[in-house]
Amino acid sequence: MASAPSVTSLADEVNCPICQGTLREPVTIDCGHNFCRGCLTRYCEIPGPESEESLSCPLCKEPFRPGSFRPNWQLANVVENIERLQLASTRGLEVEDACPEHGEKIYFFCEEDEAQLCVVCRETGQHGAHTVRFLEDAAGPYREQIQKCLVCLRKEREEIQETQSRENKRIQVLLTQVATKRQQVISQFAHLSQFLQQQQTALLAQLEGLDGDILKQQEEFDSLATGEICRFSTLIEELEEKNKRTARGLLTDIRSTLIRCETRKCRKPEAISPELGQRIRDFPQQAIPLRQEMKTFLEKLCFELDYEPAHISLDPQTSHPKLLLSEDHRRARFSYKWQNSPDTPQRFDRVTCVLAQCGFTGGRHTWMVNVDLAHGGSCTVGVVREDVRRKGELRLRPEEGIWAVRLAWGFVSALGSFPTRLALEEQPRKVQVSLDYEVGWITFVNAVTQEHIYTFTASFTQKIFPLFGLWGRGSSFSLSCQEGAVSLL
């Protein structure tokens, strides 16, 4: 059996040039072209410049006489066979392009009624005064409208997709932040639980010691008191027995007896020694470290939940040529050898500094810096305004839009209007920098000992970037994730 495409191709070969439908009662004119009898008859009835004796072929424009066309029975049989093939190839399937009223193939479209028409529908009076066009011609303007709609819809779809992608990324960031805060809460409470357990054990041990000392002194007191009671009981019994005697018996050795009574000193032992009593009174002082630790815990927990860890990396476009950056842009080392770096407007050319790639325009952020200084080296840590000068000499001070501290070999300085050397208990090797943009605080803390280093107060109106500086062969620094250091704001 012929396939559907081949049958369709055959059917196209037996279409009427006038109605574009399958030939009905095909007739042939003088030039040899074939038409539907009805189509050709109506064509001949159309008034025109041609004479009634001669008309021109609708296809080749060759003249023919109106009454000269003759039936083409052979072609009619071919059309009939092709229609049988079409019916066989589409049996069991709904013919979508057939007129439901007349069963004819649909070729036309009525603009006013928005109806699809076959040849018979077109010839009826219902659509006679309407604009009727071939399907493809009518579909053209609608295709253009569809294309315009598609452009708008695709653009809106892309915007929605971009919004979805952006919001999903934001959600992932928020989920990461929640997971980080959850871990911080678990970590801090685990630390607190361990500390409380240790404190409980220590305090209970001290109470156990006090309890043992009290029982020991009670035993000693009871022993001493019992001895005194026995001695007094013996003397009382002796006096009572002597008092029962006759006058002669009473007066015998009376002086010696009375002297023993009068010279007898009553020892009144103390149940609790003053030293033990003082230890009991001083016991509440043992809870002072616990109170301090609880205060530190609350400060630490509130800080970690309030400040967002800033996962920053170094910007190679701003790095001074003497700074060697690692591939992950999280470490830097000083070198006297200049790197072959392009002299861009963003790069520092005098001060050996580098900025972070991302800055802040609001919020609370914190980051860690590990410092490894060689002898005579120094490291500068802080923040700068976005418009900080990159070329020429630059004094690191707030007037220049720089708030930083310098860690040198053996001392630390706050780089204010005039550098101030700070008195610290320990030289920091790991510094936590905390930025509160809205309040205007930049705080530096020794991340190991929790010792407060320095706090700047400023008013920010521009984007703020983390700043790092190095000097001295062998000196280096690296950025690390926050590990729960607390800032004493």
Curated annotation (Swiss-Prot):
Subcellular location: Cytoplasm
ZnF (RING-type) residues: 16-61
Chain positions recorded as Zn(2+) binding sites: C99, H102, C121, H127
GO CC list: cytoplasm
GO molecular function terms noted in the UniProt entry: zinc ion binding
Keywords: Coiled coil, Cytoplasm, Metal-binding, Zinc, Zinc-finger
Alphabetized SUPFAM superfamilies for the sequence: B-box zinc-binding domain, Concanavalin A-like lectins/glucanases, RING/U-box
Zinc finger region(s), B box-type: 94-135
InterPro entries: B30.2/SPRY (IPR001870), B30.2/SPRY_sf (IPR043136), Butyrophylin_SPRY (IPR003879), ConA-like_dom_sf (IPR013320), PRY (IPR006574), SPRY_dom (IPR003877), TRIM/RBCC (IPR050143), Znf_B-box (IPR000315)
Keyword Iron part of the UniProt annotation: no
SS bonds (residue pairs): none
GO terms (BP aspect): erythrocyte differentiation; host-mediated suppression of symbiont invasion; innate immune response
Gene3D superfamilies, sorted: 2.60.120.920, Classic Zinc Finger, Zinc/RING finger domain, C3HC4 (zinc finger)
Annotated knockout phenotype: Deletion mice inhibit hypertrophic remodeling after transverse aortic constriction surgery.
Superkingdom assignment: Eukaryota
B30.2/SPRY domain mapped to chain residues: 292-486
Main localization category: cytoplasm
Biological function: E3 ligase that plays an essential role in the differentiation and survival of terminal erythroid cells. May directly bind to PTEN and promote its ubiquitination, resulting in its proteasomal degradation and activation of hypertrophic signaling. In addition, plays a role in immune response regulation by repressing the phosphorylation of STAT1 and STAT2 in the interferon/JAK/STAT signaling pathway independent of its E3 ligase activity. Mechanistically, interacts with the intracellular domain of IFNAR1 and thereby inhibits the association between TYK2 and IFNAR1.
Quaternary data: Interacts with IFNAR1; this interaction prevents association of IFNAR1 with TYK2.
Family classification: Belongs to the TRIM/RBCC family.
Record protein name field: Tripartite motif-containing protein 10
